[in-house]
């Protein structure tokens, strides 16, 4: 036994894959209730439409920004009750991954981390707008990523980070 630290183990940790969440923040947020206050006097029979999008951007070095955009439109009958949109973003330190793992991390793993924050922001806005709570169902980002990857392969495209 020696009192000297194992420098080889430290070197391996520094050179191996690394993932670290640096910051989560709201990049953009909006809420519109175009038919209020009249909409509050109507029978509530909502239909919900959800649009979801992600984008990634390499910042300096091994830092990446991932932005998850959720747009929710709720109609009551033929009228728009409300529209809410949130861009939930995160900055991640990611290094030591091959291209496939990096693409999956940015396209599925990071959005999965951001989704609960976006869902909570949307629910809070809806309730503050005096509408019933809107708890969005979980999203399978791995399946969405696999579908997008298949679509890109069929189109002859390759995933890129801007």
UniProtKB/Swiss-Prot annotation:
Statement: the UniProt record of this protein carries the keyword Ion transport: no
Q: Which cysteines are joined by disulfide bonds?
A: none
Q: Which domain of life is it from?
A: Bacteria
Any single Gene Ontology cellular-component annotation: cytoplasm
Q: Name one GO biological process term.
A: protein transport
Query: What are the subcellular locations of this protein?
Result: Cytoplasm
Task: Give a yes or no for keyword Transport in this entry.
Answer: yes
Against InterPro entries, the record matches this protein to:
SecB, SecB-like_sf
Q: Name one Pfam family in it.
A: SecB
Q: Which of UniProt's keywords are assigned here?
A: Chaperone, Cytoplasm, Protein transport, Translocation, Transport
What molecular function terms (GO) are annotated for this protein? unfolded protein binding
- The protein's role, per its UniProt record: One of the proteins required for the normal export of preproteins out of the cell cytoplasm. It is a molecular chaperone that binds to a subset of precursor proteins, maintaining them in a translocation-competent state. It also specifically binds to its receptor SecA.
Q: How does it assemble?
A: Homotetramer, a dimer of dimers. One homotetramer interacts with 1 SecA dimer.
**In which family does this protein belong, per the annotation?**
Belongs to the SecB family.
Name it.
Answer: Protein-export protein SecB
The source organism is Pseudomonas savastanoi pv. phaseolicola (strain 1448A / Race 6) (Pseudomonas syringae pv. phaseolicola (strain 1448A / Race 6))
């Amino acid at each position: 036994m020696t009192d000297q630290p194992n420098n080889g183990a430290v070197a391996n940790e520094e050179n191996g894959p690394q993932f670290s969440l640096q910051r989560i923040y709201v990049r953009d947020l909006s809420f519109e209730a175009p038919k209020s206050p009249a909409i509050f006097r109507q029978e509530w029979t909502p239909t919900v439409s959800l649009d979801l999008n992600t984008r990634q951007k390499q910042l300096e070095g091994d830092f990446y920004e991932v932005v998850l955009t959720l747009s929710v439109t709720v109609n009551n009958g033929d009228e728009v009750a409300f529209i809410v949109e949130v861009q939930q973003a995160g900055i991640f330190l990611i290094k030591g991954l091959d291209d496939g793992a990096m693409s999956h991390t940015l396209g599925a793993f990071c959005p999965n981390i951001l989704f609960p924050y976006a869902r909570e922001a949307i629910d809070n806005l809806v309730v503050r707008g005096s509408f019933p709570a809107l708890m969005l169902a979980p999203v399978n980002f791995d399946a969405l990523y696999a579908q997008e990857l298949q679509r890109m392969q069929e189109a002859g495209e390759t995933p890129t980070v801007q």
